[in-house]
A protein has these predicted regions:
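Flavin-dependent oxidoreductase catalytic cores
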Residues: 3-317
Length: 317
């Protein structure tokens, strides 16, 4: 799986196992659902740089930082995590997409990225149990009552049904703002134990209603976000979904993640992004000694491109 290096966090787009070996990182790539042409198969993943103002507005430094990296010839450039609500920030200096006052800065960034020749994705995010009260001034929320190291011993409030619906709307509102600003699409951050991930995990989601229980219930939050974004944006607006294959402390295990990939492949998304940390690492429990990347590629159809992250340092990789 080929890619290009950037600050240790790089990605490559894959097809199926047989065709990937015949492609090079510099080869162009067509996203099947929309026909969007990517100039090559490299993707710059979201990286946290903490340069936005307290109100979530982009600073000039942050715009320049990302545009400069986009000029490294990446086919897709992803922003840092952008928060969909004012009280879901995971850290200081985080980009915001929760209000219309963010649109001018987002427009400047999207324009600069387009002029750099890259496809732009804004990564949509909510910290959930990883949104400290010390930053947001309110009790954090999650799928269930949870806590997290670094949260000063504060437990989350489990979201009520109407609050879940409001949160889904917040993600969709943010996607609409990104489209209005000129972004080519969004990436839903369902990895790394943030809010979407908290709904997916068996340990972080202990609900017994329609938003919990089996994988169908635990994935409903993510699926409803995808459906509403698709309803409210242009058909050619791109949606990528990022997930973590394994986070044992959250109750996310490989078997469920592979099944989730199958579920997501039936929705109108354009890319599945797995955060592997090392795309070459083999899975000990796999009888064929395959990597996570190959395992996921093997369970989703060719019509859904796969982005895999981690330890891609050179074109040879």
């Amino acid at each position: 799986y080929r890619g290009c290096r950037w600050n240790g966090r790089t990605n490559s787009l894959g097809l199926n196992n047989s065709r990937v070996e015949k492609m090079r990182s510099k080869d162009s790539f067509v996203l099947p659902r929309t026909g969007t042409v990517l100039k090559n198969r490299t993707v710059l993943a979201a990286m946290t740089n903490k340069q936005s103002y307290e109100n979530g507005i982009l600073s000039e430094e942050e715009k320049k930082w990302l545009i400069r990296r986009a000029k490294g010839d990446f086919a897709i450039t992803t922003t840092a995590a952008t928060n969909v609500t004012e009280t879901g920030r995971g850290w200081n200096g985080e980009m915001g997409v929760w209000g219309d006052h963010h649109i001018p800065g987002l427009t400047d960034l999207a324009t600069g990225l387009r002029q750099s020749g890259t496809i732009s994705l804004a990564q949509l995010f909510h910290g959930g149990m990883r949104a400290p009260k010390s930053i947001n001034g309110v009790q954090p929320v999650s799928a269930s009552i949870n806590t997290e190291p670094g949260m000063d011993g504060i437990y989350t409030k489990a979201l009520e049904h109407n609050e879940i619906k409001e949160m889904i709307n917040s993600f969709a509102d943010a996607a609409v703002r990104c489209e209005e600003s000129g972004f080519d699409g969004v990436e839903l951050h369902g990895a790394h134990s943030y809010l979407i991930c908290q709904f997916l995990g068996k340990i972080t989601n202990r609900r017994d209603d329609e938003w919990g229980g089996n994988l169908e219930g635990r994935s409903k939050f993510l699926r409803e976000i995808i459906k509403l974004i698709r309803e409210r944006t242009n058909p050619n607006f791109l949606i990528a979904v990022r997930i973590s294959p394994i986070i044992e402390k959250a109750g996310i295990f490989l078997e469920d993640s592979l099944e989730l990939a199958k579920i997501l492949s039936k929705l109108e998304i354009d890319m599945l992004h797995i955060s592997c940390w090392d795309v070459f690492q083999k899975i000990e429990s796999d009888s064929q000694n395959r990597s996570l990347t190959k395992l996921f590629r093997g369970v989703i159809p060719d019509s859904l491109p796969l982005i895999s992250t981690g330890a891609v340092w050179t074109a040879k990789d």
